[in-house]
Amino acid sequence: MAHKTGAAFADYGAHIIHGAANAMYLPKVIAFNAKDETAKVRYGEIADFMGLGGETLDEKVDLLIAYLRKMNDDLNIPHCIKNYGPDSYPCEQGFVPENIFLERLPEIAANAILDACTGSNPRQPSQEEMEKLLKCCYYDTEVDF
């Protein structure tokens, strides 16, 4: 996803720094992948290794996501594309206008699915799921699919 959104808005002066994109998207991608039981177990193991606590796998995944979101806060990385601004600092309306994001969303989603990195993802998204996931990353909404 980060490969396909990084320069997708460069004509608006909105090059999303690759590391910032990964940081913004990772909590959402974990929430998406954790719908797969094998991936959820692995995320639980990561949370255990990090000493995050939690009794159930769902709690462990939630704590892992919360940890990553807190790290983004500490690093001054916004939680979503909508608030991504100059030098990756959060702002009320970032570089990527909503109408442009929505206009380009189908193509970005299709390209993200075709990206070599997506092939190693534990859960393979459909076009519709990738568009929904990218919207979650734009608006910072819950991944409930």
What does each of the following model-derived ranges do?
Residues N99-F145:
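Short, amphipathic C-terminal "tail helix"
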